[in-house]
Regions:
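N-terminal basic, Ser/Thr-rich segments that initiate or prime the first beta/alpha elements at protein or domain
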Residues: 1-161
Length: 161
């Protein structure tokens, strides 16, 4: 667990599930399989020069796979007394602080690959798109619990306004 100074104190950031890496790599492999197989077929049937395109596609797939692995490692979140904070990115960093009082609703979404790995995405909606956020790669039970807790905190904060 990494700590970062925010508001003058060291805070424990919660990482997302490592299963998110596997799920995203499966999606990448499925997406790249069609063009790679197509270039192999064309190289075998028409001209061997297409092997260059096959090699390029394989290298691109490997590079994107590495980037995905690093990217997922940079996603974390924390619940603060007044806001929920999502941190993403190593090169293009973003830090989204969502005040509980601005929460409109919270969704839990999970596609077929994510469900197979037992993970879901938590999507937090506010009136402003700039203060909304998505937190991918949470274990399904944790995402459901967090959704319930955030919705309750949002309702309590709005009632106090």
């Amino acid at each position: 667990m990494e700590t970062v100074t925010l508001r003058g104190g060291d805070l424990p950031w919660q990482p997302v599930s490592p299963a998110l890496v596997r799920a995203r790599l499966i999606v990448l492999a499925l997406a790249m399989a069609i063009p790679i197989v197509a270039t192999i077929v064309v190289a075998l049937v028409l001209t061997p020069w297409v092997w260059i395109a096959t090699g390029i596609l394989i290298v691109v797939t490997a590079v994107v796979g590495y980037v995905v692995t690093r990217q997922v490692g940079a996603i974390s979140w924390i619940e603060l007394p007044e806001e929920f904070v999502i941190r993403k990115g190593r090169v293009l960093r973003s830090l989204v602080a969502i005040p509980y009082g601005r929460l409109q609703f919270v969704d839990v979404q999970s596609g077929p690959v994510a469900r197979a790995y037992g993970i879901a995405s938590l999507q937090i909606h506010t009136a402003s798109p700039q203060s909304s956020g998505t937190l991918p790669g949470l274990p399904i039970a944790q995402a459901e619990e967090l959704r319930t807790r955030l919705a309750a905190l949002g309702e309590a904060q709005r009632a106090g306004l």
